[in-house]
Structure formats: structure tokens, C-alpha cells
């Protein structure tokens, strides 16, 4: 998780300092054990073990278990087995997305896939030993790790004050009614560029996450690619979308569903979000902003034309 975490505690109580310290420690533990960018991390040690058992700390064990739950909940649209695809596109290590245009040559090792096929994922868990068996393909927890860290930090901070906000790399959990008593006001960044948001959300006891290709896009062998991998093709999702924002009662599932809806793309996102009752806002490649039915209650303001 290449993100910093920020906490806001409105009207803190006597427990606040201790709870903030605890929440910071939780975030750091998740970031340390669940990163794919450190070969010595618990996640990468589990990836190296493959079909063999690997003992991991509790936060990594719980994150992999949560990833399996999300994989099942989304019927395979969320799939952490994206590491080989990202590595084959040159994203095996951190890249300076925010400071320069990136052009790379593809690496060997990416696997092709028949379009439309969802592959079952069946990792193993040994609770007594805190051990996991991820399987024959390495996994990346980037699609759920921030959301889980925000969830666990928010749970630690919940009783630290009247209202709490936890934010990590755009994943947000808003607890309570906020400083003004009418909800936390959260802006949704435009994926088309510029500093003006496409919407402002009013949230109370809700999480929000956005999946966007505004930053993590680069060129490989002359082709524009991005980091959101479609598990049906093992290639960057061809979705005709720029970003998807989801409001949910849980930050991990806000993150999971924002990516899953991005993957199904412009042609299917409205049906899936409405069928699942998901509060979603999406911006397509032409800059059009669209809301699902369930999102309307959270929108305090939205742009009329991007």
C-alpha cells in the first residue's frame, strides 16, 4: 500500500491519543505485511511458498481470508491473482506515476486467458498455525488492503471522539455526523484532470472508495495500459470508464466493489450496481458522470457537465 493514512477526531475524548497511536500501528502493520513491493513481506513469502503452507502474521492472514470472501461475493470479478499480469506490464516494482510519463517494454511471463472465463480461487487456511496456502499463482492485496486497513483503524478509533474520519489513499471511513453536524463532506476527484471535483458526497457512518486510472496509467510497447486487471482476460480492463466511486457501510467492500464495477465496464455497470443495491458513481471516457439509484441520497452536489 503506497499510501499515507490520516485521522481526524472531532471532539476527542481521554482515550483519543492512545487510540490514534494504536490505529497508526495497525496501519503500519498491514502495510508492512501485505505489500507486494517488499520481497521480505509476509505476503511475498506466502507467494513464494505457493501451494505450500506459509506462516503469516494475523493481519496478513485476515487480509487473505477477506480477499477470498470478496472473490466469492463478487463472483470472481475481484481476484487478487493479478501480480503476474502487472509484472508482465512492467509494474513489478513501484513506479513514479505522479511525477512523470512512463513508457516501458513488456516483461515475459504474463499468461493469456480465454475471455469470459472466471477461474475459481481456493487458498488454504490453517487457523491454529496462522498459516496460508495461496496456490500456484501469486496474489496482490492492493485491491483490498487499503480498505481493510481503513476498516481496522476505524474500528480502533470509533470511540475516540464524537466523529471520526479515516482516509488512506482516497479510501475513506466517515463515522458520526462530522464537525458541522450534517455529515462529512467528501469530494470525488475528476479522473479527467484538474482540481475541481465531479461530485461532493455527504456521508454519516459510511465508507467511500474510488477506483481510477487517472494516476496509475502508463505505456507498454506503445500501448496505454493501467493497473485494474480484468480476471477474465488478465489484461487491463477495457471498460470505457475513467473512474468508479462506491459508497458502502464497509471500506473494504467499497474498494472491492469500485474495482469490480470498473471491470464490468460502462455497458454493464448500471445493471450490476442496481441489482446489488450498490451506491455507485462513475465517469466514462467522455467525461460523463452517472449515478446508480442507491447513490442519489449521498450526493450533495454534482457537476452537470465535465
Predicted regions, residues:
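Mature catalytic core of soluble alpha/beta enzymes
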Residues: 1-306
Amino acid at each position: 500500500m503506497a499510501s499515507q493514512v490520516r485521522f481526524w477526531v472531532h471532539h476527542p475524548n481521554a482515550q483519543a491519543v492512545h487510540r490514534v497511536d494504536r490505529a497508526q500501528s495497525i496501519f503500519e502493520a498491514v502495510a508492512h505485511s501485505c505489500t507486494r513491493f517488499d520481497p521480505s513481506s509476509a505476503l511475498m513469502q506466502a507467494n513464494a511458498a505457493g501451494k505450500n503452507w506459509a506462516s503469516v502474521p494475523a493481519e496478513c492472514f485476515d487480509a487473505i481470508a477477506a480477499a477470498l470472501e470478496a472473490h466469492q461475493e463478487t463472483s470472481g470479478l475481484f481476484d487478487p491473482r493479478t501480480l503476474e499480469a502487472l509484472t508482465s506490464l512492467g509494474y513489478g516494482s513501484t513506479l513514479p506515476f505522479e511525477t512523470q510519463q512512463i513508457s516501458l517494454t513488456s516483461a515475459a511471463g504474463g499468461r493469456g486467458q480465454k475471455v469470459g472465463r472466471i477461474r475459481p480461487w481456493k487458498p488454504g487456511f490453517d487457523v491454529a498455525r496462522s498459516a496460508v496456502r495461496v496456490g500456484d499463482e501469486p496474489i496482490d492485496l492492493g485491491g483490498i488492503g487499503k480498505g481493510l486497513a481503513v476498516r481496522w483503524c476505524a474500528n480502533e478509533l470509533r470511540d475516540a471522539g464524537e466523529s471520526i474520519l479515516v482516509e488512506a489513499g482516497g479510501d475513506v471511513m466517515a463515522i458520526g455526523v462530522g464537525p458541522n453536524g450534517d455529515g462529512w463532506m467528501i469530494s470525488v476527484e475528476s479522473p479527467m484532470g484538474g482540481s475541481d471535483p465531479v461530485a461532493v458526497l455527504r456521508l454519516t457512518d459510511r465508507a467511500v472508495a474510488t477506483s481510477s486510472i487517472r494516476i496509475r496509467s502508463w505505456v507498454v510497447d506503445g500501448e496505454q495500459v493501467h493497473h485494474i486487471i480484468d480476471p477474465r482476460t488478465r489484461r487491463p480492463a477495457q471498460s470505457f470508464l475513467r473512474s468508479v466511486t462506491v459508497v458502502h457501510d464497509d471500506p473494504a467492500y467499497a474498494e472491492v466493489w469500485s474495482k469490480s464495477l470498473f471491470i464490468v465496464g460502462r455497458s454493464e455497470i448500471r445493471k450490476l450496481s442496481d441489482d446489488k443495491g450498490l451506491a455507485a458513481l462513475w465517469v466514462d471516457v467522455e467525461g460523463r458522470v452517472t449515478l446508480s439509484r442507491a447513490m442519489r441520497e449521498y450526493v450533495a452536489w454534482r457537476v452537470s457537465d465535465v
